[in-house]
Amino acid sequence: MDNEMTLTFLALSENEALARVAVTGFIAQLDPTIDELSEFKTVVSEAVSNAIIHGYEEDGKGVVTVHAKREDDVVTVSVMHKGIGIEDVSQAMEPLFTTKSVMERSGMGFTIMDSFSDQLTVMSKWREGTTVTFTKKFYTVRTAVM
């Protein structure tokens, strides 16, 4: 393992930016392209937002943990909460499915995460919590300094 980090915070909407910045800083060690950075930042944002919005019935009544691990040029991030969980993971991963339509949620979070990562895994137990894990290999080309 080359490096890893863990960040735990209250399930508050404003902490989504904290998680996004922390993970973006963590992967900056790989010298990613702007596109790679932007896509990965979007995946982190979607996963953390889902954990905050869908994981707990009240803001700040639980915690979200983000764990990132880098091995060579592959980064794996897990976003975990011990809140409500997902009753039907297959249904939740369908495009446009949302349990929060009154909040104008688009239901595209898992679709976006899946399209911007190399691998996406969702493990959930109803009323026990959810772990969303995504992996991305970075293909940056470094030039030698002479």
Curated annotation (Swiss-Prot):
Q: Which Pfam families match?
A: HATPase_c_2
Q: Which Gene3D superfamilies match?
A: Histidine kinase-like ATPase, C-terminal domain (3.30.565.10)
Can you supply a Gene Ontology BP term from the record? sporulation resulting in formation of a cellular spore
Query: Which molecular function GO terms apply here?
Result: ATP binding; protein serine kinase activity; protein serine/threonine kinase activity; sigma factor antagonist activity
EC numbers, comma separated: 2.7.11.1
UniProt keyword Transmembrane helix present? no
What does the record give as the reaction this protein catalyses? Answer: L-seryl-[protein] + ATP = O-phospho-L-seryl-[protein] + ADP + H(+); L-threonyl-[protein] + ATP = O-phospho-L-threonyl-[protein] + ADP + H(+)
Alphabetically sorted, this entry's keywords are: ATP-binding, Kinase, Nucleotide-binding, Serine/threonine-protein kinase, Sporulation, Transferase
Sum up the protein's function in the record's words.
Answer: Binds to sigma F and blocks its ability to form an RNA polymerase holoenzyme (E-sigma F). Phosphorylates SpoIIAA on a serine residue. This phosphorylation may enable SpoIIAA to act as an anti-anti-sigma factor that counteracts SpoIIAB and thus releases sigma F from inhibition.
Q: Which family does it belong to?
A: Belongs to the anti-sigma-factor family.
Q: What is this protein called?
A: Anti-sigma F factor
